[in-house]
Design a protein with these regions (language model features):
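Conserved hydrophobic positions within beta-strands
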Residues: 41-43, 94
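Bacterial N-terminal signal peptides
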Residues: 8-20
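Short nucleic-acid-contacting surface segments enriched for D/E, G, S/T with interspersed K/R
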Residues: 80-97
């Protein structure tokens, strides 16, 4: 009987420990689907690294102030299958990014699509839990 009780406690704790990981991988937990955002800026850095890629942009507002934005992209594996490489988005180029702003209204977003200077575009998102459909 004691072994059964310990097994139940252990299983309950194991399941409870996975909840933060599931929440972290939820689009809706971090980003607001009701706050689509369009960003035009200069790439300062692109990180094609696990678990998510990151595009760093310098945006100049209409008032002339500079903002440093971080745009989260999909996992490198997913982006590479869609045609991305480490040199797809070099520092210094002007890009247009569509996405969804962070719930905390920081200068952070989940990227949906990026348009490069030559007019080509790449899907930069993931199809995670709560993310808008790619269709």
């Amino acid at each position: 009987m004691r072994l059964r009780g310990l097994s139940i406690i252990f299983c309950t704790l194991a399941v409870a420990a996975t909840i933060p990981a599931i929440a972290h991988h939820s689009f809706a937990a971090e980003f607001d689907i009701n706050r689509p955002i369009s960003l035009d800026g200069v790439v300062t850095r692109f990180e094609l690294s696990n678990p998510h890629s990151w595009l760093h942009l310098e945006i100049t507002t209409e008032a002339g102030e500079k903002q440093q934005w971080q745009v989260e992209g999909g996992a490198p594996n997913a982006l590479i299958r869609r045609g991305w490489t480490r040199t797809s988005v070099p520092a210094g180029i002007q890009v247009h990014v569509e996405g969804f702003q962070a719930r905390d209204r920081s200068f952070r977003a989940s990227g949906r699509e990026i348009t490069l200077p030559d007019g080509s575009s790449l899907f930069m998102g993931s199809v995670g839990i709560g993310a808008p459909s790619t269709e």
